[in-house]
């Protein structure tokens, strides 16, 4: 195929999908269904499939795997990589976007490949958790260069009892107490302390782990073996929860990527935050995006984290806190209000939100394909 042109970069979904008014139907009810649909769609699209099995099991004792669909050249010079499910329960939107991409992929040049990594944290998706089987936030776990697995932000230590009570979920005026902490320390300081990542409280929120986790380890091994020869890589890591409801926010990792902010914003037709662009809501330690250049040092790279906004931050952090308490101090079963609240907080049930998530996810890949495979990148 010829390289994708700018005119093809942002198609309306109804032009490339047979039933765009039902984009929400790309959403699956659970991990097992999502995995089955992804693998079937990959085979229909003529994609090659790689499967990376994990030792952890799902709630029905089902196998948990990271599945990777590969379209295009088997030894590509240019690669567009789309990842879903780094934060388990957030994978429902990323999985849906990947099904849409398999139904209507962008054109690929002879030396190009589109690679879709389906659910880096299948345990979290299967059990409706943001963290993995060891309570590790995988986007705080990629310490591949410095190997520092200790410590926590000083303010997190002061917030630990508020964030991580050693008891099942209960009414405890969390919102008022968090607001008081924001008044005392500053809202931005509290947000940064909570979300930055910590390695001191293994049962706490945003725990980065004490070692590299099985999912990231499998991913890194696969990445270096399969994509180590690529000259150029554009990676998109799709998440949910941050930003205005149903809108997408694009975040650039500090120090990753050679294109200017203005050039990349023009190519993607979206403003960027983070890096040299506008400030991000918070910075994190041990992110996947920050690790990528060191994993593929010979590859020219661009990376964007795409967030699809859901609900206000207080609702999201409250849902994360309740589910975490249920996991550690209840029985952790799926049939509990805390699980349903977390799913709604990070994957709203409304069709209009789900259609917007698919449109944003699918559209960004098309625009990134124009950048990656266009004549200027050849």
Where are the language model's segments positioned?
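Structured catalytic-domain cores with a bias toward divalent-metal coordination
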Residues: 2-378
């Amino acid at each position: 195929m010829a390289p994708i042109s700018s005119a093809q970069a942002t198609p309306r979904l109804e032009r490339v999908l047979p039933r765009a008014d039902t984009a929400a139907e790309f959403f699956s009810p659970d991990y097992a269904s999502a995995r089955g649909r992804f693998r079937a769609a990959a085979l229909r699209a003529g994609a090659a499939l790689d499967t990376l099995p994990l030792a952890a099991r799902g709630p029905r004792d089902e196998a948990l795997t990271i599945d990777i669909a590969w379209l295009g050249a088997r030894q590509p010079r240019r690669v567009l990589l789309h990842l879903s499910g780094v934060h388990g329960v957030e994978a429902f939107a990323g999985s849906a976007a990947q099904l849409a991409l398999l139904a209507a992929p962008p054109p690929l040049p002879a030396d190009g490949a589109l690679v879709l990594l389906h659910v880096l944290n299948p345990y979290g998706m299967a059990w409706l958790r943001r963290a993995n089987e060891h309570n590790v936030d995988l986007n705080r776990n990629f310490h591949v260069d410095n190997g520092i697995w200790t410590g926590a932000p000083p303010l997190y230590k002061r917030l630990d009892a508020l964030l991580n009570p050693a008891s099942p979920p209960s009414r405890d005026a969390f919102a008022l107490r968090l607001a008081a902490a924001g008044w005392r320390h500053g809202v931005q300081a509290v947000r940064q302390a909570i979300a930055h990542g910590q390695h001191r409280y293994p049962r706490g929120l945003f725990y980065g782990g004490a070692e590299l986790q099985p999912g990231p380890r499998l991913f890194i091994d696969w990445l270096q073996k399969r994509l180590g020869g690529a000259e150029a890589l554009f990676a998109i890591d799709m998440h949910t929860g941050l930003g205005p409801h149903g809108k997408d926010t694009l975040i650039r990792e500090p120090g990753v990527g050679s294109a200017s902010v203005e050039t990349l914003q023009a190519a993607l037709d979206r403003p960027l935050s983070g890096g040299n662009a506008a400030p991000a809501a918070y910075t994190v330690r041990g992110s996947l995006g920050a690790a990528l250049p060191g994993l593929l040092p010979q590859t020219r790279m661009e990376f964007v984290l795409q967030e699809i906004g859901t609900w206000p931050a207080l609702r999201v952090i409250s849902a994360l806190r309740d589910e975490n308490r249920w996991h550690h101090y209840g029985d952790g079963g799926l049939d509990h209000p805390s699980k349903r609240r977390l799913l709604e907080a990070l994957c709203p049930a409304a069709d209009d939100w789900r259609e917007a998530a698919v449109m944003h996810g699918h559209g960004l890949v098309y625009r990134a394909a124009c950048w990656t495979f266009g004549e200027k990148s050849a």
